[in-house]
Amino acid sequence: MLPATLPLDAYRPFRRDVEAQRPAMEAIAARHGLPPGELAPFSQGTQIVWGTQRSVIKLFVPTWPEDTRIEMLMLERLVGAGLPVPQLEARGEVAGWPYVVMSRLPGQRVPEAWPELDADARERLAHDIGAAMAHLAALPVTGLDALLAPQESLLGERRPRLLQDQRERGGDDALEAQLQAFLDALPPLLPAESVLVHADLTADNILVHDGRLAGFIDFADAFVGPWTYELAATSCFVTQGDRRSQRALLSGRGVETTPELLVTLRCWAVLHRYSHVATMMQRAGHASLWSWLDTLWLP
């Protein structure tokens, strides 16, 4: 039904092969009483995700067991937490591949919803996102020591990897020179308490319904780290320099806009584990790293 495991070069075509995935998904649906006629694949995501009208099945390739462990840990941790997140319905294995069944949240991803929103609606949505971030950050982190990455540890991980990561993600010599200058001039970051962070709140992981936040999805990258880190992905992929939305995001998060905070947020926008600087600069129409960062977080 499924291969025992798949290296990355074999997984990519398998991820696109809907018919190869179908027998496993139908078996899971039958096991948990989901209507097989409603099963349909999702195109987004690293893992294999299918859904019915009310539920979502997420099938984890055994190649990355850490993703599975974190996602399941977070789904269990967030049950009853009062956050707009999928609720865990079942978990198991099929042919050695772990999976979860969870509730399906309503709404569209941000790239589909944002262009249809006026300035007031965007401001409300950004405030909703910030408030949900604050709610997540307020949850206890007891028992999550394995996910701990305090600010200095995270910086120690990210700084040496920046140039190589961005080269692999489409950066050229000109960008590498700018990134090296960025590293050479990296200022002290605002001290930040370690809290529970989703860590990948890009536009694809935020759902919108009727102009308001419907929920956060995909917690496989979550960890316990500096609260400032959480704002980086959302600033790059959602508010994208829109001043009203930016202010609303910070207001919803319950933090004051200070020069020190803005400097820190610019730094995390570059140093984020999943930052694609060349792509983001190109989309924003900037050849200069510094001008792009200035538009992300205006004073």
Stretches found by the model and what they are:
Residues 15-31, 106, 122, 126-127, ...:
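An alpha-helical support segment within catalytic cores of ATP-dependent transferases
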Residues 38-150, 191:
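ATP-binding pocket architecture of kinase catalytic cores
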